[in-house]
Amino acid sequence: MSEKIEGDGTDLTISANNLTIDAAADITLDADGADIKFADGGTDLLGFANSSSDVVIKPLVNAKDIIFHQYDGTSILEINDGAYAKFTAAAVAPEATLTDGATVSWNALTQQVAKVTLGGNRTLASASSGVTGEFISLLVIQDGTGSRTVTWNAAYEFASDTAPTLTTTANLGDLFVFRYNGSKWLEVGRNLALTLS
């Protein structure tokens, strides 16, 4: 196939076996029609669209998925046409260490899996930035002295409205799991007096 550039006064077509766009700085694709499409053999496959300044990425062939591969071709993430995401391996929220202090703050959006070592009797603030339906976990660890207590913010809801009594043994941990209902962090599980090493 020979290279050619064709224009009809409205549209421009560039044809070639291989086409390389090489810019010393940036490349900007600016589509006032709000859509940028990738096609294969004349069939649209993937689209990027502007929806009130939200970016929409979607396959343009019905009943097809968007699949992310790592370098060796292994599938890592599949955005399935059935409206779910499938991970080849676990999706992991790294454990965050909360800052110990008189009041312990916790961001549920960036610290979903958290731990704190108590250096005294503390108040646990309500986990901020919660999303309805979100699960979070907190490992509360006694320091080398032990017998530290926690006063829980009213946003944490426990069975029978009774807050738990922490383990008092030095260096042991208590693990709590909560689910957010839009206004309260509902406890869904706990394990007390855990040996951590």
Where are these regions (language model features)?
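Conserved short histidine dyad/triad with adjacent acidic residue
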Residues: 120
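Beta-strand-rich, repetitive solenoid scaffolds
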Residues: 1-24, 28-32, 36-41, 45-51, ...
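Solvent-exposed, conformationally flexible loop/turn segments
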Residues: 101, 169-173
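Extended extracellular/luminal ectodomain segments enriched in beta-structured repeat modules
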Residues: 131-133
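Short, intrinsically disordered N-terminal pre-domain segments
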Residues: 193-197
